[in-house]
Amino acid sequence: MEKRVLVIEDYSSIGNCSLTAGIPILSAFGTYPVGLPTALLSTQTAGIKGFTFVDLCDNMIPAYKHWKKLGIKFDCVYIENDKGRNRS
C-alpha cells in the first residue's frame, strides 16, 4: 500500500517548483502525495518580479479538518522551507 504524504507548499502556476514539482517527484518514489497549498502564485518567485500572490493559510486548518472527518490519515508530512524567499 502506498504511503500517503501531506505536501504543504505554495502552488506556482508557472515554474518548475513548489507543489507542481513536489507532487510528481514524491509520486515517482511510490508515495501518494496530497497537496495542501499555502499560497497561489502567478509564477515562481526565483528571478521573477511582479508575480501575484494569494495567501491560502486561512484555508489550511479547515481543509485538514475536512480530511479528518473523512477519515483521511497521512503517513508523513513534507513542509516547504521558504526561508529567505523574496516576496516582492
What are these regions (language model features)?
Residues 2-88:
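Ribokinase/PfkB-type carbohydrate-kinase core domain
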